[in-house]
Design a protein with these regions (language model features):
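Conserved small/polar residues in nucleotide/adenosyl-binding loops
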Residues: 201-203
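Ligand-binding beta-strand-loop-alpha-helix segment within the catalytic cores
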Residues: 2-79
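Active-site rim loops that border cofactor/substrate pockets in soluble metabolic enzymes
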Residues: 72-117, 126
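Short, solvent-exposed amphipathic alpha-helical segments in soluble enzyme
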Residues: 85-89, 134-141, 166-170
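Short, flexible loop segments at boundaries between secondary-structure elements
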Residues: 143-169
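Conserved active-site and cofactor/substrate-binding residues in soluble primary-metabolism enzymes
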Residues: 17-21, 35, 39, 53, ...
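Hydrophobic/aromatic beta-strand patches that form the interior of the parallel beta-sheet core
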Residues: 68-70, 119-121, 149-154
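Hydrophobic alpha-helical bundle architecture
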Residues: 114, 128-143
Length: 203
């Protein structure tokens, strides 16, 4: 058996390959067109609702409650392997993931919202995507407010290019986040997030 490591998490390679093949199977049955990651994750939710052995996963729970999940770097994951397998099997007619349409959809959500805030665990592509909706809206000629608040829980340090090379204070200089209501929390998320959630439950 092979073991894969993702940061501090160990995964059975055989189980991971089952996931890849399942993604391929889901894609094979879909209408041939472009999908945003949100649309494709809805299809994963539908599949899990019928076929999952273990209930209560994040994706299935989001599907049950009509909560959208966006994954801007969807292809930069094991699930991306499943889509490559799908395209290899169907070279002429296959689905694609449209990250540009997805960014446009996220921007439209920002444009339509009365106010917005960010709660980020980690960083990377999702952090940049959601912050940049403010700038994208302005480039489209829409007058939008900055995100009113932002909290980021991370162990990354911006000095060496990690943390997406910037703290939330720097994000405020781009007009993305209100600088008076931002907080960097330098901590391991699994030790901090449960405390935050518990506090919210008891408010």
């Amino acid at each position: 058996n092979y073991i894969d490591r993702i940061y501090d998490t160990y995964i059975d390679e055989n189980e991971l390959q089952i996931c890849d093949k399942t993604i391929c199977e889901i894609a094979d049955k879909l209408e041939v067109r472009s999908y945003t990651s949100r649309e494709f994750i809805v299809e994963i939710g539908k599949y899990l609702k019928i076929n999952s052995k273990k209930k209560g996963s994040l994706i299935e729970t989001a599907y049950d409650n009509n909560v959208p999940i966006f994954c801007p770097a969807f292809t930069d994951s094991s699930a991306g392997f499943g889509l490559v397998m799908h395209q290899e099997k169907n070279p002429e007619k296959h689905i694609t993931i449209d990250s540009i349409r997805e960014f446009r959809e996220l921007t439209e959500i920002k444009i339509q919202s009365k106010g917005s805030g960010l709660f980020m665990i980690g960083g990377g592509v999702p952090k940049n995507f959601i912050q940049d909706t403010v700038i994208c809206a302005e480039l489209l000629g829409k007058d939008v407010d900055m995100h009113k608040y932002a909290i980021q829980i991370t162990v990354a340090d911006s000095r060496d290019g990690a943390c997406s090379s910037s703290t939330l204070k720097e994000a405020s200089s781009w007009g993305k986040v209100n600088t008076t209501k931002e907080q960097m929390v330098f901590a391991e998320a699994t030790s901090v997030l449960p405390l935050v959630i518990l506090s919210l439950i008891h408010i």
